[in-house]
Curated annotation (Swiss-Prot):
<dbReference type="GO" id="GO:0045892">
    <property type="term" value="P:negative regulation of DNA-templated transcription"/>
</dbReference>
<feature type="zinc finger region" description="C2H2-type 1">
    <location>
        <begin position="395"/>
        <end position="417"/>
    </location>
</feature>
<keyword id="KW-0805">Transcription regulation</keyword>
<feature type="zinc finger region" description="C2H2-type 4">
    <location>
        <begin position="479"/>
        <end position="501"/>
    </location>
</feature>
<dbReference type="GO" id="GO:0007366">
    <property type="term" value="P:periodic partitioning by pair rule gene"/>
</dbReference>
<feature type="zinc finger region" description="C2H2-type 3">
    <location>
        <begin position="451"/>
        <end position="473"/>
    </location>
</feature>
<feature type="region of interest" description="Disordered">
    <location>
        <begin position="183"/>
        <end position="204"/>
    </location>
</feature>
<dbReference type="Pfam" id="PF00096">
    <property type="entry name" value="zf-C2H2"/>
</dbReference>
<keyword id="KW-0862">Zinc</keyword>
<dbReference type="GO" id="GO:0045944">
    <property type="term" value="P:positive regulation of transcription by RNA polymerase II"/>
</dbReference>
<dbReference type="InterPro" id="IPR013087">
    <property type="entry name" value="Znf_C2H2_type"/>
</dbReference>
<keyword id="KW-0539">Nucleus</keyword>
<keyword id="KW-0863">Zinc-finger</keyword>
<dbReference type="InterPro" id="IPR036236">
    <property type="entry name" value="Znf_C2H2_sf"/>
</dbReference>
<feature type="zinc finger region" description="C2H2-type 5">
    <location>
        <begin position="507"/>
        <end position="529"/>
    </location>
</feature>
<keyword id="KW-0010">Activator</keyword>
<keyword id="KW-0479">Metal-binding</keyword>
Length: 578
C-alpha cells in the first residue's frame, strides 16, 4: 500500500513537470521526478506479492469499507494507471517513462479485482445453497403436514418447522452482508485547457453482484473461460472496473450507468399462512370423507351380519370378544354407533315377527316325521334368535337356570318348582299361584261372565278364555298340524300335538331317568319326587298323595290302574296347570 501511494505521488509530480517543461528551471526538476518514479517502481516490484495478499484480505473485509472516503488498493492502482495514460502530448518524455508502470499496475489491479469477485461469488454461492436448503425444508414440511390429520400434534410440529424455516429465510435475505444490491456511482467531469482523468468513485466491492438465478451462469462462464485461455477469468466486477477507466482529451465527458441486480422474492408470511390453512382444510375434508365412508361401510356390515340361529337346547353366551382393529373409526364414531343401535332394534322387531309366523311356515315342510321335527326345530330356533336380540336377562331361576327380565316373573316361576299357592278362594278353598288367576276364578262363583264374544255372544269368565274362543270363528286356524291337518286354537297345544307324531321324548327326569314328551309332564313328575321326600318316601309300594284327594301315582310307576285313579290323575293335572 505504501508503494502504491509513492507511485501515485511520483506520477502526479511527473505530470506537473511535463506541463511546465517550457521554463528551464522546471525542466531541470524533471530528472528528479523520473528518479522518484524509478524508486517507486522498485518498491512496487518488491511488494507485488504483498499486493495480492492485501487484495484477498480486502475481499473478506469489504463490508467495513466506506465508498466515499477510503478507496481500495485496486481502485487506487486503476486511478494511477489512468493518470499515467492521460498525460498531455506535450510531455513525450513523461509519457514514455510512465507507460511501463501503467501496464504493470493495470495487471495488478485486474488480478486483485478478479480475486475479489471470485471470493464474492463463492460467498454468494454458499448463501444460495443455504437458502435453497431452507426452502426445501419448508416445502417438505408443508407437504407432510397436509397428509396428516388437521388437529394432530405431528401436523402442528411440521407447520411450526415450516414457519421457522420461512422466518430464517426472511432474516437471511434481509442482511446486506449476504446479498448486496448496490448501484455504481456516477462520476462526470468537464475539463477545458487541461488534461484530466475521469474515474468512478466506487470501489470494486460496490459493483453489482449476480443474483441467485445468475450464479449457475456465472460459474459456467468462468469455467469455460479458464479452460479456453491461460489468462485469469474476468467476472462482472472486473469488467465493470475496466469499463470505468478511459483516457480523455481536453474536452471529454464520461458517465457510468448504474446497474442494479434483483433477487427472486420469497413468499410473504400471509402467503405461507394461507398455504398452511389450505393444507389443514384439505386434511379436514379428507378426514370427514373417510369418516362418512366408514359410517356407510359399518351400516352395510350391520345390515348383512345377522346372528346365527340357536338350537332349542343351546345356551346363550355373552362372552366379550376382541374388537377388530380395522373398525376403530367406526367404534368411536357417534353417528355410526347410533345407526348400529337403530339397526339392532329393527332386527329385534323382525325376529319377534318371524317367531309368530313360524307356525304357518312349518306347514310347508315335507314328510310325516321329518316335517314335524323340522317345524319344531325352526320354531325353537326362531324363539332362540328372538331371545338373543332381547336385552340381557338378569334374574335366573335357581332350580332350572331359566332367565327372566323381571323379578316378579321369576317369583311366579319358582312357585312352579315349590308348588306354592298363596292365593286361595274364600268360597271353595282352591289355591292359585297368581292373584289374577284368583280374580278370574271368582267369576265362576258369581256366575258373572263379563267377557263376551262379538261373533256368537258367548260369555266367558276369563279374558284368556275368550281369546282362545275367538280362534274358533276364524276360517282357518293359524295353528294347524302339517301332518294330520288338525287345527288348534292355541300354539302350545299344536306343539304338544306335534310330539305325538314322533317318538322323541326330549324331557328326562334327573332323579329316575324317565323321559317325557311334554315339559309339563316332567314338572308334574318332578313334584312327586320332591313331595315324597318330604313325607318319608314310599309306603307299601305306593307314593303318598300330595294333594290329599286319594289319587294314586301308580300310572307313573307303570302299575295297573283303575277308573278311579285315572280320574284322580286328570284332576291333579288340572290343578298343577293352574
Amino acid at each position: 500500500m505504501e508503494a502504491v501511494k509513492h507511485l501515485s505521488a511520483a506520477a502526479a509530480a511527473a505530470a506537473a513537470a511535463a506541463t511546465c517543461s517550457d521554463s528551464p528551471a522546471k525542466a531541470a526538476a524533471s530528472p528528479a521526478a523520473s528518479s522518484d518514479i524509478a524508486e517507486a517502481l522498485g518498491e512496487l516490484k518488491a511488494s507485488a506479492t504483498a499486493a495480492a495478499s492485501s487484495a484477498s484480505k480486502a475481499a473478506t473485509s469489504k463490508h467495513h469499507s466506506n465508498n466515499n472516503h477510503k478507496p481500495s488498493a485496486a481502485a487506487t492502482a486503476t486511478a494511477a494507471h489512468k493518470k499515467s495514460e492521460s498525460c498531455n502530448s506535450n510531455g513525450n518524455k513523461c509519457t514514455a517513462a510512465t507507460s511501463p508502470i501503467g501496464s504493470k499496475t493495470s495487471n495488478a489491479a485486474m488480478a486483485a479485482a478478479t480475486a475479489t469477485a471470485a471470493a464474492a461469488t463463492n460467498d454468494l454461492a454458499a448463501a444460495a445453497a443455504v437458502v435453497l436448503s431452507l426452502q426445501g425444508t419448508m416445502v417438505s414440511s408443508l407437504q407432510q403436514a397436509a397428509l396428516l390429520p388437521a388437529n394432530s400434534a405431528a401436523a402442528a410440529a411440521l407447520n411450526l418447522q415450516a414457519l421457522e424455516s420461512y422466518l430464517a429465510l426472511q432474516r437471511l435475505t434481509g442482511k446486506s452482508d449476504v446479498f448486496r444490491f448496490s448501484n455504481s456511482n456516477t462520476g462526470s467531469s468537464n475539463s477545458n485547457n487541461a488534461t484530466t482523468c475521469n474515474s468512478s468513485s466506487s470501489e470494486a466491492d460496490n459493483n453489482a453482484l449476480p443474483s441467485l438465478i445468475d450464479i449457475a451462469n456465472i460459474e459456467l462462464k468462468s469455467s469455460c473461460s479458464s479452460s479456453s485461455s491461460g489468462e485469469p477469468p474476468l467476472t462482472a466486477a472486473t469488467a465493470s472496473a475496466a469499463a470505468t477507466s478511459s483516457p480523455s482529451s481536453n474536452n471529454s465527458n464520461s458517465t457510468s450507468t448504474p446497474t442494479t441486480s434483483k433477487c427472486v422474492p420469497l413468499p410473504s408470511i400471509g402467503t405461507v399462512s394461507a398455504a398452511v390453512a389450505a393444507a389443514a382444510a384439505a386434511a379436514a375434508a379428507a378426514a370427514s370423507q373417510q369418516a362418512a365412508l366408514d359410517c356407510a361401510t359399518a351400516a352395510e356390515l350391520a345390515a348383512e351380519c345377522d346372528l346365527p340361529l340357536l338350537d332349542g337346547e343351546d345356551a346363550l353366551s355373552f362372552e366379550a370378544g376382541d374388537l377388530d382393529s380395522s373398525y376403530g373409526s367406526f367404534m368411536f364414531n357417534p353417528s355410526a354407533f347410533s345407526q348400529a343401535e337403530t339397526d339392532s332394534a329393527l332386527h329385534s322387531l323382525q325376529a319377534t315377527m318371524y317367531q309368530d309366523k313360524m307356525s304357518v311356515i312349518s306347514g310347508a315342510a315335507g314328510g310325516v316325521g321329518a316335517g314335524a321335527v323340522g317345524g319344531l326345530e325352526e320354531a325353537g330356533s326362531s324363539a332362540a334368535a328372538a331371545a338373543a336380540q332381547r336385552s340381557k336377562k338378569q334374574f335366573i331361576c335357581k332350580f332350572c337356570n331359566r332367565q327372566f327380565t323381571k323379578s316378579y316373573n321369576l317369583l311366579i316361576h319358582e312357585r312352579t318348582h315349590t308348588d306354592e299357592r298363596p292365593y286361595s278362594c274364600d268360597i271353595c278353598g282352591k289355591a292359585f299361584r297368581r292373584q289374577d288367576h284368583l280374580r278370574d276364578h271368582r267369576y265362576i262363583h258369581s256366575k258373572e261372565k263379563p267377557f263376551k264374544c262379538a261373533e256368537c255372544g258367548k260369555g266367558f269368565c276369563q279374558s284368556r278364555t275368550l281369546a282362545v274362543h275367538k280362534i274358533l270363528h276364524m276360517e282357518e286356524s293359524p295353528h294347524k298340524c302339517p301332518v294330520c291337518n288338525r287345527s288348534f286354537n292355541q300354539r302350545s297345544n299344536l306343539k304338544t300335538h306335534l310330539l305325538t307324531h314322533t317318538d322323541i321324548k326330549p324331557y328326562n327326569c334327573a332323579s329316575c331317568g324317565k323321559v317325557f314328551r311334554r315339559n309339563c309332564d316332567l314338572r308334574r313328575h318332578s313334584l312327586t319326587h320332591n313331595l315324597s321326600a318330604g313325607v318319608g318316601g314310599v309306603v307299601g309300594g305306593n307314593l303318598s298323595d300330595p294333594f290329599g284327594s286319594g289319587s294314586s301315582s301308580s300310572s307313573e310307576l307303570g302299575l295297573p290302574t283303575g277308573s278311579a285313579s285315572t280320574a284322580a290323575s286328570s284332576r291333579d293335572l288340572v290343578a298343577v296347570s293352574d
